[in-house]
A protein has these predicted regions:
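A surface-exposed beta-strand-loop module
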Residues: 89, 93-153
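Glycine/proline-rich low-complexity spacer/linker segments in large multi-domain proteins
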Residues: 128, 137-184, 233
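Hydrophobic helix-coil surface modules that form long, contiguous segments used
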Residues: 74, 176-314, 343
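N-terminal, polar/Ser/Thr-rich
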Residues: 1-2, 6-7, 22-73, 154-157
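Zinc-dependent metallopeptidase catalytic helix centered on the HExxH motif
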Residues: 178, 300-360
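Beta/coil-rich, acidic/histidine-enriched accessory regions frequently appended to metallopeptidases
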Residues: 53, 422-472
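Surface-exposed beta-strand/loop patches in extracellular or lumenal glycoproteins
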Residues: 75-96, 171-174, 183-190, 431
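Acidic/His/Gly-enriched intrinsically disordered linker/tail segments
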Residues: 218, 338-407, 450-455, 459-461, ...
Length: 472
């Protein structure tokens, strides 16, 4: 994510092996009934998010949307595997009215509970280790939820975007980064509208009155990184030198951003030099003309607000490595996403592509904010619920630049690439990252990491200015 406020602050500051995900299980204390999947996985910030007892392997959505009336009809088909005996389980969903639910083709009892839960009781119990199929039929007017899900655009179209939540406003899912699944969606709209989503477009058929468009994402994705966008788009199709197709869309009032997106092949080439091969089979962007407060790294095809600039495009595409391919384990791990995306866009691109003296920029930033207690008051690791998207954008780049100087470029850059590649299509956590850093050097890093990641005051000079930063 790249917020408008973060963009303003950034502007001032600038003047391995694949890891297989484990079954999703809930903390033991919430399992009151061993045959009922837990309604929430106990994330410290969002304990009700996600659901225990099963793992989703694939989402298959069939949607019909009527923009003038904001009417959405959908059938969500989920392919899942039970992790325990189940006579009941829950999904996350706060979208339109649910009309019917089936499990393995048989009608199931269901009930809407809490703010965003759909409780399901299959006709027959589910056995651990076996696959099962869920189908949810729903329809109704979609609520306009700007910045946190389904959003109506100025043209009357719509798109879905939000972090950490958005997907549950338009389809039922297991809404946790721990349960990533493959994804496909087919959307039918009046013929004059276009539809864009994640992955590759595999079908676009018009019958004279309606258009049906299908998109498929073959690599696993967290729910909040899925999107669908419906508008009178103009398209830009490009290819990288290796043949990777890039598909970008521009809403009617966003076509002026086409020049930015022309640089996407160059941006992805640059990011590969830092973090290894691009992790997906396609890329692109969706440029909306709604007054969003953020841009978002929706997988393969970020959502861009009207104020997007080059820094934003670099930031969101860095997330394809740090945040999308490798996702957080808990939301307290958000520095793994935003610290790296911000450092790459604010420091590495200016340094290597524009010739900026980023050491000088670092020192000037530290001097400017060193005596500002508010700048240091929130820890980088575990910033707290509702504060995830604050200091990771401003202090995050400072931390990584200091770490780079402490380790040296010859260690820092290969090590960061190895870490993100080792967690490709999986999850990582900040405690794991800290332990990994210590394996890179005989220097004891405990004090340095505690000062930067846990502290709420400026680090001591030895940690603020390690290595050649002390020579400025």
């Amino acid at each position: 994510m790249h917020t408008r406020m973060r963009r303003l602050v950034a502007g001032l500051l600038l003047a391995g092996a694949s890891v297989s995900p484990a079954p999703v299980t809930a903390p033991a204390q919430v399992l009151d009934d061993p045959a009922v999947g837990a309604p929430g996985l106990g994330d410290p910030y969002y304990p009700d998010d996600g659901n225990g007892g099963y793992r989703v392997e694939h989402y298959d959505l069939t949607l019909d949307y009527d923009p003038p009336n904001r009417q959405l009809a959908g059938i969500a088909r989920l392919s899942a595997i039970a992790a325990q005996p189940l006579r009941a389980f829950e999904l996350d969903f706060n979208g339109p009215e649910v009309r019917a639910v089936t499990v393995n083709g048989r009608p199931a009892l269901f009930e809407r509970t809490g703010a965003h839960k759909l409780a399901v009781s299959p006709l027959l119990p589910l056995l651990p280790g076996l696959p099962f199929a869920i189908a949810v039929d729903y329809a109704g007017q979609v609520t306009d939820t700007p910045d946190s899900g389904w959003t109506v655009s100025p043209s009357g179209g719509a798109f879905a975007a939000g972090e950490p939540h958005s997907a549950a406003t338009w389809y039922p899912l297991n809404d946790t980064p721990l349960d990533k699944a493959t994804f496909e969606v087919r959307v039918t709209v009046p013929q004059e509208w276009e539809v864009v989503s994640n992955g590759l477009r595999t079908r676009d058929v018009a019958d004279g009155t309606h258009r049906t468009v299908e998109w498929r994402l073959r690599d696993p994705v967290a729910g909040y990184l899925t999107t669908v966008a419906i508008d009178h788009f103009e398209f830009l199709e490009q290819r990288r030198a290796d043949g990777t197709p890039l598909f970008s869309a521009f809403a009617p009032q966003a076509v002026s951003r086409r020049e930015l997106e022309n640089r996407l092949p160059e941006i992805l080439d640059f990011l590969e030099t830092l973090y290894g091969p691009y992790p997906f089979e396609t890329g692109g962007g969706i440029y909306v003309d709604t007054d969003l407060q953020f841009s978002l790294e929706t997988q393969t095809r970020p959502i861009y607000a009207p104020w997007t600039d080059l820094n934003t495009v670099v930031h969101e595409n860095t997330h394809q490595w740090w945040g999308d391919s490798m996702s957080v384990t808990q939301w307290s791990d958000i520095c793994l996403n935003e610290c790296f995306a911000s450092y790459t866009a604010d420091y590495l691109w200016p340094e290597r592509k524009e010739g900026k003296d980023v050491d000088r920029m670092y020192r000037e930033t530290v001097d400017k904010y060193r005596d500002d207690p508010d700048f240091w008051s929130i820890p980088l690791q575990n910033p707290g619920a509702g504060r995830e998207f604050t200091v990771v954008y401003t202090r995050g780049p400072l931390f990584l630049h200091a770490l780079r100087h402490l380790l040296g470029d010859a260690i820092f850059f290969p090590a960061m690439s190895r870490f993100v590649q080792a967690h490709r299509y999986g999850n990582a956590a900040m405690p794991e990252f800290r332990s990994y850093l210590q394996t890179l050097t005989p220097i004891a890093l405990g004090g340095f990491l505690a000062a930067w990641l846990d502290g709420t005051t400026p680090p001591p000079d030895s940690d603020l200015f390690p290595g050649t930063l002390s020579l400025g």
